[in-house]
Amino acid sequence: MFLKVQLPWNVMIPAENMDAKGLMLKRAILVELLEAFASKKATKELGYYVAVTTLDKIGEGKIREHTGEVLFPVMFSGMTFKIFKGEIIHGVVHKVLKHGVFMRCGPIENVYLSYTKMPDYKYIPGENPIFMNEKTSRIQVETTVRVVVIGIKWMEVEREFQALASLEGDYLGPLSEE
């Protein structure tokens, strides 16, 4: 789910990027904010940082004594992406294993669908392994699958989420390729 957020942030601008007219200063603040925002990746509370939408307020700059850099407190609006337990999502399979499949959903790389949560699907080994049911519905690499999220885990060191998914429910499963 995408969330609209308003966040405070501190932006450091080197002295050489300061401009008396102010126009270049606002640009320098925006560039530094975008770089810092992109490098942060995600937080447990807000999910993955996706985009800065508006720079709402630039506070008064404070000069750092030893470096000469100027610290500007800013307020901006942005978009984040976070999944929740019980949410229905679409994932694209990128790895098929005997015990389940790994999918991607937006910036989330590890959504795991266990074979125990795929009723009626059987593993078929081979060069390109798949899961198939009696109706010949297939789950294989590059298949888009509609699933329900049954668990979420925040990985602090990697700064990313992992999720567990299930096909147990109405209207869940591989989406047709029509």
Swiss-Prot record:
Pfam families: SHS2_Rpb7-N. One of its GO terms (cellular component) is RNA polymerase V complex. GO terms for biological process: DNA-templated transcription initiation. CDD domains: RNAP_II_Rpb7_N. It is found in: Nucleus. Keywords: DNA-directed RNA polymerase, Nucleus, Transcription. InterPro entries: NA-bd_OB-fold, RNA_pol_Rpb7-like_N_sf, Rpb7-like, Rpb7-like_N. DNA-dependent RNA polymerase catalyzes the transcription of DNA into RNA using the four ribonucleoside triphosphates as substrates. Component of RNA polymerase V involved in RNA-directed DNA methylation-dependent (RdDM) silencing of endogenous repeated sequences, including transposable elements. Belongs to the eukaryotic RPB7/RPC8 RNA polymerase subunit family. PANTHER family: DNA-DIRECTED RNA POLYMERASE II, III (PTHR12709), DNA-DIRECTED RNA POLYMERASE V SUBUNIT 7 (PTHR12709:SF3). Component of the RNA polymerase V complex. This is DNA-directed RNA polymerase V subunit 7. It comes from Arabidopsis thaliana.
